[in-house]
C-alpha cells in the first residue's frame, strides 16, 4: 500500500501541473516587456503551470559599433537563445518575429505568432524639431536608422535628408537623439515604442507609400524545439490566425527572394473581405531603383483552434497545428507568387547589386 502511495506522490510531482516552463529572452527592456506579455497570456491559459524567465545577451546586443547589415552573420539576435533551447536550458524563446530568419536551424520551429501590433515605422524627432515631419525637416538634416530597408525607401522619398546608421537598443538610440546634436530624427518601429509606453515620442507614423515595413514587423514569434510536442501544444494558444497568415505570406515572399538583413526588402499586408493583399518591394541601397507589386488571394481566416493538420510540417519556419492547413498554404503560395513576379521584373539584379555594395563598404 505504502509503495503505491509513493508512486502516486511521484506521479503528482512529475505531472504537468508541477512543471516549471523556462522562457528565454534577450536582456533589453523591450525584450523583457514583450516576454512578460507572452508569459502573462500563458499564465492565464495555464494557471497550474509556473513560468521562469531567463534573460541573456546576444551577438546583436554586444556589437554596437557596426551596422547590422555589415556584421555579416545571420541570427544576430537569436543564436545564443537557440543555443540555450538546444541544450534544454529553456523550453521556449520569445523573439520579435522580424529577427527570426525565414529558414531556422534544424530542430527549431516557430510554435506561435502572437497578435500583431502596429507594424509601421515611426519617426521620433529631436526636441528642437518636435512638430515637424520628415518632409518639413531642414535641408541636409541627419536621420538615424539601423535599417537598409528604411534608408533606401526614405532616401527616395525625401532626397533633402541624409540617413546615417544608429545602433543600440531603444533606450540607447533615444538617448543619442536627445543628448547629442548629430541626429534631427530617428526611425523606429511603432510597436516597440508603444510597448515601452513611449507613445508621446511618436512624431509621425510612416504610411506604406512612404515606407513599407519589415517582414514580420510588429509581431512576436515564440520559438521552440520542433519535436517538443508538449510545448508546441502549450504555445499553440498564442497563435493569432490573421497575423499568422499575413506573416506566412510575408516570410514566403522574403524567403523566395532570398532577402535578408543586408538587402532592402519591404512588405505591406492587409486582410479585407476574405482577401489577403500582399505588397512587396525591393530597392537599391540608395533607393534610386525599385520594383513594387501587389497581389491578392482569397483566404478564409479560420477561428482559433479549428482542428489543424496533425502532421505539422513547417511552413517558412512556422508550425501551427491548430490552424487549418489550406489557408496557410494559400498564404505561402501568395508570397511565392509575388516573389516570382518581382524576380521576373529584375528584382534579383537589384538585390545582387545591393548585396555587393553593402559587402564592399
UniProtKB/Swiss-Prot annotation:
Outcome, altering residue 26 to C: In AIP; severely decreased hydroxymethylbilane synthase activity
Top EC class of this enzyme: transferase
Modified residues (N6-acetyllysine): 74
Impact when changing residue 225 to Q: In AIP and LENCEP; uncertain significance
GO MF annotation list: hydroxymethylbilane synthase activity
Modified-residue entries (N-acetylserine), positions: 2
Outcome, altering residue 256 to Y: In AIP; severely decreased hydroxymethylbilane synthase activity
Consequence recorded when altering residue 124 to D: In AIP; severely decreased hydroxymethylbilane synthase activity
Record-listed E.C. numbers: 2.5.1.61
Annotated phenotype, changing residue 30 to F: In AIP; severely decreased hydroxymethylbilane synthase activity
Cofactor(s), names only, from the UniProt record: dipyrromethane
Positions bearing S-(dipyrrolylmethanemethyl)cysteine: 261
Keyword Repeat set for record: no
Cofactor remark: Binds 1 dipyrromethane group covalently.
Effect on the protein upon substituting residue 235 to E: In AIP; severely decreased hydroxymethylbilane synthase activity
Temperature dependence (free text): Displays high thermal stability. The half-denaturation temperature (Tm) is about 74 degrees Celsius.
Subcellular location per the Swiss-Prot or TrEMBL entry: Cytoplasm, Cytosol
Family note: Belongs to the HMBS family.
Disorder association: Acute intermittent porphyria: A form of porphyria. Porphyrias are inherited defects in the biosynthesis of heme, resulting in the accumulation and increased excretion of porphyrins or porphyrin precursors. They are classified as erythropoietic or hepatic, depending on whether the enzyme deficiency occurs in red blood cells or in the liver. AIP is an autosomal dominant form of hepatic porphyria characterized by attacks of gastrointestinal disturbances, abdominal colic, with neurological dysfunctions, hypertension, tachycardia and peripheral neuropathy.
Quaternary assembly: Monomer.
NCBIfam families linked to this entry: hemC
Protein name: Porphobilinogen deaminase
Amino acid at each position: 500500500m505504502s509503495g503505491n502511495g509513493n508512486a502516486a506522490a511521484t506521479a503528482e510531482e512529475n505531472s504537468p501541473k508541477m512543471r516549471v516552463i523556462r522562457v528565454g529572452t534577450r536582456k533589453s527592456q523591450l525584450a523583457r516587456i514583450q516576454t512578460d506579455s507572452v508569459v502573462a497570456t500563458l499564465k492565464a491559459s495555464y494557471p497550474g503551470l509556473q513560468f521562469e524567465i531567463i534573460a541573456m545577451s546576444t551577438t546583436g546586443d554586444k556589437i554596437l559599433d557596426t551596422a547590422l547589415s555589415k556584421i555579416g552573420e545571420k541570427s544576430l539576435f537569436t543564436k545564443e537563445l537557440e543555443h540555450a533551447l538546444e541544450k534544454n536550458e529553456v523550453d521556449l524563446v520569445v523573439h520579435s518575429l522580424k529577427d527570426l530568419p525565414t529558414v531556422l536551424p534544424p530542430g527549431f520551429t516557430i510554435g506561435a505568432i502572437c497578435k500583431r501590433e502596429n507594424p509601421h515605422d515611426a519617426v521620433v524627432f529631436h526636441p528642437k524639431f518636435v512638430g515637424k515631419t520628415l518632409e518639413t525637416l531642414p535641408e541636409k538634416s541627419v536621420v538615424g536608422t539601423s535599417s537598409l530597408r528604411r534608408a533606401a525607401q526614405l532616401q527616395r522619398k525625401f532626397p533633402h535628408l541624409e540617413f546615417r546608421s544608429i545602433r543600440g537598443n531603444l533606450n540607447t538610440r533615444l538617448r543619442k537623439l536627445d543628448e547629442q546634436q548629430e541626429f534631427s530624427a530617428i526611425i523606429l518601429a511603432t510597436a516597440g515604442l508603444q510597448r515601452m509606453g513611449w507613445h508621446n515620442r511618436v512624431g509621425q507614423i510612416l504610411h506604406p507609400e512612404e515606407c513599407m515595413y519589415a517582414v514580420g514587423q510588429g509581431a512576436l514569434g515564440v520559438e521552440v524545439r520542433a519535436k517538443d510536442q508538449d510545448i508546441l501544444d502549450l504555445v499553440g494558444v498564442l497563435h493569432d490566425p490573421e497575423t499568422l497568415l499575413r506573416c506566412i505570406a510575408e516570410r514566403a515572399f522574403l524567403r523566395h527572394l532570398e532577402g535578408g538583413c543586408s538587402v532592402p526588402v519591404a512588405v505591406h499586408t492587409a486582410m479585407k473581405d476574405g482577401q489577403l493583399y500582399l505588397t512587396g518591394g525591393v530597392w537599391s541601397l540608395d533607393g534610386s531603383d525599385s520594383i513594387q507589386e501587389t497581389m491578392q488571394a482569397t483566404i478564409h481566416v479560420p477561428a482559433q483552434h479549428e482542428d489543424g493538420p496533425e502532421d505539422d510540417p513547417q511552413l517558412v519556419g512556422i508550425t501551427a497545428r491548430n490552424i487549418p492547413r489550406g489557408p496557410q498554404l494559400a498564404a505561402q503560395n501568395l508570397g511565392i507568387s509575388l516573389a516570382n513576379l518581382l524576380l521576373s521584373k529584375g528584382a534579383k539584379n537589384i538585390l545582387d547589386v545591393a548585396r555587393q555594395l553593402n559587402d564592399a563598404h
